[in-house]
Amino acid sequence: GSAANTIAGLASLGGAGGFIGKVHDDQLGEVFRHDIQALGVVFDCAPTTDGPSTATSMILVTPDAQRTMLTFLGACVDLGPDDVDEDLIAASKITYLEGYLWDRPSAKEAFLKAADAAHRAGRKVSLSLSDPFCVERHRDEFLDLVERYVDILFANEEEILSLYQTGDF
């Protein structure tokens, strides 16, 4: 997902970081764990043995660079507050939250626990709105999240316009 890609990109550029997320105890989960750790990213979450398999995504790109994603969120939707490593968050300068995971109640609890832990440690919280459809589904909750917790907001123009329900910004 975008959070894993973000931290992998940061690590590839020489930055340090950790990732909190769910993978299944399957081949894709093992490959993900190996690859992200090979970049130097801390990823200590135990694989799950219950529920759906590790997430996958097929990305189709047209010659004019338009893209369509066919995504199965898989095990990552089972992220919950028990998965949040507060020590890892306290050691981080910025905690990055991905809006795509806001659909599940357990993920919301994990987000809030992570944001609380970051602020208690004097750290910053960032949020990616992810896409306009995600914003439309969660507008009121995202507005509250931004007001109460978010120090850095990542969004494109369409996402910001959707969040604040305005024609321009």
Predicted regions and their residues:
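Glycine-rich phosphate/adenosyl-contacting loop at the front of the ribokinase-like
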Residues: G1-I20, E30-V31
